């Protein structure tokens, strides 16, 4: 019987890909920071609405990456954030402060959750459930 090498991939009970998450961390941070900035600029000046579309695309891509590394709860939140930004863009002539606040909270929550997962090396989907369900409510989708 041999011991696993120190170079072997660390697998947890949930089987998410922790080494890949470590590698993706800087890109995830940039994506979330940009989304936050685009939302803020749109909040200050609705003529900046096209910036939201950049974040719609990048958050949709992030969602797919999170699914690929088996971080399903991150996928759900990033996907909901993308849909929320799309709704804000589509309804830019009708300000929706509740949706803006919920998307902002979701961006912040996802950033903190990624840090939590990296630090604790485990997942805790229940931490994301309240904001995912709030965004689903804003989007007229069923909760999880």
Task: Explain the meaning of each model-derived region.
Residues 1-18, 91-144:
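Structural secondary-structure packing elements that flank or coincide with functional cores
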Residues 2-6, 29-39, 63, 73-86, ...:
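Extended amphipathic alpha-helical scaffold segments
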Residues 12-57:
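Long, amphipathic alpha-helical coiled-coil segments characteristic
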Residues 35-46, 66-69, 85-95, 117, ...:
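Secondary-structure edge/capping motif, primarily at the C-terminal ends of alpha-helices
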Residues 48, 59, 82, 86, ...:
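Solvent-exposed, non-transmembrane amphipathic alpha-helical segments
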Residues 51-55, 69-84, 98-106:
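Short, well-ordered alpha-helical segments
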Residues 56, 63-65:
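Beta-strand-dominated lipid-handling architectures at cellular/organellar boundaries
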